[in-house]
Amino acid sequence: MLGAIGVVFGDIGTSPLYALKECFNPEHGVPFSTQTVYGVLSMLFWSMTLVVSIKYVVFVMRADNNGEGGILALTALAMRASSGGARTIRTLMLLGLLGASMFYGDAVITPAISVLSAVEGMEVMTPALQPWVLPLSLIVLVGLFLLQKHGTHVVGRLFGPVMLFWFVLLGLIGLFSVLRSPQILVALNPVHAIEFMFRHAVQAFIVFGSVFLALTGAEALYADMGHFGARPIRYAWFYIAMPCLLLNYFGQGALLLREPSALQNPFFLLMPTWAVAPTIVLATAATVIASQAVISGAFSMTAQAVHLGYAPRMKILYTSDVEIGQIYVPVVNYALLLLVVAVVLAFGKSDNLAAAYGIAVTTTMLLTTGLVTVVMRNAWKWSLPAVALLGTVFLAVDLSFFGANLLKVAAGGWFPLLLGGLIFFLMVTWHTGTQLLKARNVEGGIPLEPFMEGLLSHPPYRVDGTAVYLTPSIEFVPLALLHNLKHNHVLHSRVLFIHFRTQAVPYVEPAKRLVVKTIGDNLYAVAADFGFKETPAVDEIVRMVGERLGIVFEDMETSFFITRATVVPSQLPGMAMWREALFAWMQHNSAKPSDFFRIPANRLVELGSKVEI
């Protein structure tokens, strides 16, 4: 449970730094009064209860894909459970890709707004420190991204204790404030939220977008389920995170009743003067942890997208020999670094960034609701009325937040939408392009087994050693083999044709990983199944095949053959020429097979071919 507190609740746990302050932003036009404080807090309390506690913790977390959560795992589960045709499956896939794409917008905004809001606490100590806020925030953020290549397994042990201390601090300072003004607890009554919405309908709708800031990070409860399990996350939420968060929000509300001038920064003004400086240090540590969780999530999401065929191959490094989930994706890391620095410089203050925050997350939450209803109906076999009732309630809440956040588009919300939309377009282009490439290969493909039978009837010279051909299909002859026979006129004494298949589950049991078929004299067709959270290791597969067949494949006598296709855009049916050119560029710049499949470069033979799509 301590590990879950350190990773899962970092984002939502740092929301008190800015959420309530943003609700009373003067630009929203909310008249300040005791009743509006009650109304805003009541909206916040019931939103957290409905969205986080009921929707995510009770229902969404039940939709685990063999223990894994997250939008892509949910999409794979919904696609597997769907009873619809190809069009329905494609629609579900597109919804999942859109939700995953929007996550990257969140991955840029979260580190920027979290660290900025923590460092801005220095202004509470003295306005003279204001010029240092931006430089110090950038130093913290740049340092965080530069440390990623070393992994987080060492400092990660501190995440749990630091965040536990953070939540205890949130709860205690909030409790002391509530005890001084206990009347704030009347805001627990939903009547105050309803009255606020009726009396100040326009302002309440605008504030709804700011209330949502208190919920950002809720999706992490589901996304990180595979790392910690559902039960520890549920316990940590109900017994630690939620009580401490609510105490702090209500404590800030109580402070506003006593001192309306505290609106400038109610979180830090809740502290005694002597505690502000150490709290800034702790808050910065908490926001770094929250940022780390989002960055690690971006790495994990990218790896899943690559394995599911939604993104080009990328270099994925493993930073820990102990924890399998500790990965580092250099391209994603430096892209996020550049974007985060650009966002901090462009927006300058957490108040300005708050306008950009939320729209991407609400989109992901809305799509999650849609996918979960599919799982409820098709996988859990719930009755249609039950699914319709729950789906309607959740969609009504999600659409309200989505609509309120749409008002922020002009003020900065356009950025995560633009970024998410661009990534979505690239993912769809890549997926469509790979399908076209497979179709072209099948059209001109030569069936493997008849070809090998004919070849062995008049066999070429057999040379010592083992040849491993990585192929997109074990039904057809790999182009690399055709090139090898054409130019070298030899066949190795042992030949493996290996095809990697990604299944719609996170992990595949080792006993079910291989399907090995003998197709001739020391010729074997191998289908190797992997989950979408696993990265294929060719050496390991060759070893497993050897154990299955009772053969020892010596490393230095085994060569790997891969065909690297050069895509040529054409007028053939498919995508527009400019999209085909984009796909060709992405394919050309994808990671080398030796890097992705972890093949020693001195044992790899890469043969090229041109394919028109």
Curated annotation (Swiss-Prot):
HAMAP family: Kup. The keyword Transport applies. Transport of potassium into the cell. Likely operates as a K(+):H(+) symporter. The gene is kup1. It catalyses: K(+)(in) + H(+)(in) = K(+)(out) + H(+)(out). Belongs to the HAK/KUP transporter (TC 2.A.72) family. This is Probable potassium transport system protein Kup 1. It is a multi-pass membrane protein. Its main location: membrane. One of its GO terms (molecular function) is symporter activity. InterPro entries: K+_transporter, K_trans_C, K_trans_N, Kup. Keywords: Cell inner membrane, Cell membrane, Ion transport, Membrane, Plasmid, Potassium, Potassium transport, Symport, Transmembrane, Transmembrane helix, Transport. GO terms for cellular component: plasma membrane. It is found in: Cell inner membrane. The chain crosses the membrane at residues 40-60, 93-113, 127-147, 158-178, 201-221, 237-257, 266-286, 288-308, 327-347, 356-376, 384-404, 409-429.
